[in-house]
Amino acid sequence: MAQLTDDCFAFSGPLLPLTDMERLIGERVAPVDGVERVPLRLARGRVTADDVIAPVALPPFDNSAVDGYAVRHADLSAEGDTKLAVAGRLMAGAQSDVAIRPGEAIRIFTGAAMPAGADTVFMQEDVTVDGDTVAVPKGLKRGANSRFAGEDLPAGNVALPAGTVLDAQHVALAAAIGLTELDVRRRLRVAIFSTGDEVVEPGGLRHGAAIYDANRFLLAALLERLGAEVTDLGILSDDPDGLARALKNSSAGHDLVVTSGGVSTGEADHVRGAVEAIGSLVFWRIAIKPGRPVAMGVIRGASHNESAAFVGLPGNPVAVFVTFVRVVKPLLRRLSGALPQTLHPLPVRVAFAYKKKKDRREYVRVSLRRGVDGELEAVKHPQDGAGILTSLTETDGLLEFAEDVTSVAPGDRVGFLSYADLMN
């Protein structure tokens, strides 16, 4: 489980800016212990535990990038065509002990090892073959159409840094240097539950003032997409003692506990008090909209050696989504040993006017369309309440308004974050 100190997220201000939150996580939260070796076919989505060093060069030998003729560049005329004798033939995979001599060319195919002495390859469609000779044109640069040993990755270099979240391309690189297994961090173990007397299980009996619980399903899907092992603890009622017991029990065997609902200041919002009764709630408001009431802290189990990070999210599902991708995800990456992720909002033209308060980061759900001039522009969803789930299903991503922005007008450019980028 996560070994955390009570002040690991410590912040003394009333509203925590997102940049300060990310800095505190990076400085004061340590990755969980535990490393395991997995085969390449099971490695996607896992986090490398150590630097992966290339045991061989990539490519391991000089080879041709095309079907054509290997030559010595020193033999080529700068004034016109050069006629060379075709002295051999090399296929991909064939063991080559051929050495090219002055005035010769070797017929070669893509991937075949370059003959000793050759440094340049002419594509077959650029030459003229006449019996046992080939005429090659002037102007080709030394090394053209050739792939040299180690140009992709020299032997002994870092192929994959520690903290890499492995995707298909990383697994392919590991295979290309001959590896069959990788050492990765163990998966994070995360417990989730929803709170509220008004929340019921989907498919269950719903009285007139109740709503079906969507938040646990949203959180489970997001967590599993990021590689965590999820324990679903269901729905807890608004009972302070019951919440405290559930939190205390959930800290055992889990690295992180994530809840939704009950972190605001209402009379029925008991999560904050429950956390403070069994641990430390070190901040509970972040300068973000939607989702300002976000609690983060540490909860302790029955044993003094057991503790888990805690995040309490708001109850509205859109606020849950936004705060998860911008608050929980950086914490997950740090706990899992992954390198920090830098989001790069792409500037798009805004097709609406908007005003916001200063000193908070704000996210607006938008769809992308082509303007009359063909340029991409963002259109705000007509309903922007934090409980409007269709505002997530009917849009393409979020516009990110920085803390110092107070208004935008049609035609302004604002950073756009796609849902795919936010969730991966």
How would you label these PLM feature ranges?
Residues A2-T19, Y69-D232, S237, E377, ...:
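Short, glycine/charged-enriched hinge/interface segments at domain edges or termini
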Residues T19-E22, E36-R41, D50, N63, ...:
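Flexible glycine/proline-rich
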Residues D62-S64, L76-E79, D97-R101, M114-A116, ...:
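Solvent-exposed alpha-helices and their adjacent loops that cap or buttress functional pockets
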Residues P14, L18-E22, E36, L40, ...:
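Generic structural signal for well-ordered, non-membrane alpha-helical segments
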Residues M1-L18, T180-L313, P317-T323, R334:
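Helix-rich terminal scaffold detector
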Residues V29-D33, D51, M114, N157-G163, ...:
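Structural signal for hydrophobic packing residues in well-ordered secondary-structure cores
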Residues F11-H73, S77-D81:
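Intrinsically disordered, low-complexity, positively charged segments
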